Structures are given as C-alpha cells and as structure tokens.
From Swiss-Prot:
Keywords: Cell cycle, Cell division, GTP-binding, Magnesium, Metal-binding, Nucleotide-binding, Septation. GO terms for biological process: division septum assembly. Belongs to the TRAFAC class TrmE-Era-EngA-EngB-Septin-like GTPase superfamily. EngB GTPase family. This is Probable GTP-binding protein EngB. GTP binds at residues 21-28, 48-52, 67-70, 134-137, 167-169. It comes from Acinetobacter baylyi (strain ATCC 33305 / BD413 / ADP1). GO terms for molecular function: GTP binding; metal ion binding.
Length: 237
C-alpha cells in the first residue's frame, strides 16, 4: 500500500522498520538487494509515488518495511517539498508501530544536515537505528574504511550508539550484515521466495538511476566540522 499522508496509512499496529535517506542515497537499490528482487523498486522518470509513504510486508502484515520519501527532493517544486517535509515529520512523530530506522547515507557525503536531524530525532524517540554508508564501491577499501571510522567517531561525539556498516548494492558488500540486522528485528531471512506486494512498491526516481552512473573516482567530502553546530540543538525534523 502507498499513502500520500499519515491519515491514509495502513492501520497503526504491528512492527515497522522505515528506510530513510536523501533522494539519491541509493535507497531503492538497497531494498532491491535486501529482498533479492531486481524490480522491487521499479524505475520511473518522474518522482510520482516516490513521494508517498510505501508499505510492504515480509509475508506477515504485522511486520512491515516502509520506504519513506527521500528528503532533498531535488526535482520537486518547493511547495511539494514543504508538504512532504510536514508529512514525513507527522509519520516520524506519531507512528506508534515505527520501531526503528535504516538510515542510508552516500559514503561520499555522510552526515548531511537532514541526516543528523534524523539521528537526533530517532535518539529522542529511543528507536533503534542502523546506518548504511551506501555506494561503498565508489571508494577504494582504505578510504571507505576511513570514512566508516570517521563517522563512528562523530557518532560517539554526538553520544549516539547506533550500528553502522559499509554497503554496496552493486557488489553486494555488506548485504549479509544488513540481512542479519533485519533478522534480529523481523521474521526475515535473505530468501528469494519471500512474498512481496508488488502493487505497493515504491518507484525509483530518475535521479536515483542517474546517480548509479556517477564517476567512481569521486572522493568523500565528509568533514566533521559541519556537525559541531548541530550537537547542542534540540532534535527536530
């Protein structure tokens, strides 16, 4: 099921884990890899249903994955950005079945402003968070591991004890680790036979698809200095 706003979402019962991140963080690709279904997140040239809250179950209607609209909305008009920021806020604050987040961040651009806001908010709600540094294949092993270490140190500075890993949907790096995390929270196994509701599947934006073709020589712009200004702020979305 897909819902344009909180009031139209599926019944607020059971257990949900939401996938969140910027619109170009590789969210659709990660979901496809996790579920072993290449077309789970179907491609689209328009934002369309990617600007909806998308629910689908892992064979059990009481255990759901939720694909949230990517924050950033690069190709979306300003009015729609404001509307969806409000709907995202409503979901995150009021959804009682929401038990945790998988937060996706491009390894070359981790801990952007909205990422830190999401982390602070999740901490304030006492949700579990598992962080994916996506597109790890874009960096060599040494630089990728350094970004992982830098982000861990920044999380420690922020007094956040969230789990974090490297991930690449292209070469499946970190897929088993992610599957293990999901298995610890849901009745989930990395299995091609899972029964998904394909009518309730989010579509990938053109921006998502184009981003997969970005120059692999691009280096990380991670800098802990831009985090300091947010450490003492009250969590908000």
């Amino acid at each position: 099921m897909s819902a344009p706003k909180l009031s139209l979402c599926v019944e607020d019962t059971g257990y949900e884990i939401a996938f969140a991140g910027r619109s170009n963080a590789g969210k659709s690709s990660a979901i496809n890899s996790l579920t072993n279904q290449k077309q789970l997140a179907r491609a689209s040239k328009k934002p369309g249903r990617t600007q909806m809250i998308n629910f689908f179950s892992l064979g059990n209607p009481d255990q759901r994955l939720v694909d949230l609209p990517g924050y950033g909305y690069a190709a979306v008009p300003e009015d729609m950005k404001r509307i969806w920021q409000k709907e995202l806020e409503n979901y995150l604050i009021h959804r009682q079945s929401l038990q945790g987040l998988v937060l996706l961040m491009d390894i070359r651009h981790p801990l952007q402003h909205f990422d830190t806001m999401m982390l602070e908010w999740a901490h304030s709600r006492k949700l579990f968070v598992h962080i994916l540094l996506t597109k790890a294949d874009k960096l060599n092993r040494g630089p990728a591991n350094q970004v992982l270490l830098d982000v861990k140190q920044t999380l420690k500075k922020m007094k956040l004890s969230f789990s974090i890993q490297l991930f690449s949907s292209l070469n499946k790096q970190g897929l088993e680790e992610l599957a293990s995390v999901m298995a610890g929270r849901l009745n989930y196994t990395l299995d091609k036979t899972l029964d998904f509701d394909l009518d309730a599947i989010p579509e990938a934006t053109e921006d998502d698809l184009n981003d997969e073709l970005m120059d692999q020589d691009e280096t990380s712009e991670f800098n802990t200095e831009n985090i300091d200004d947010h450490l003492d702020q009250e969590p908000k979305i």
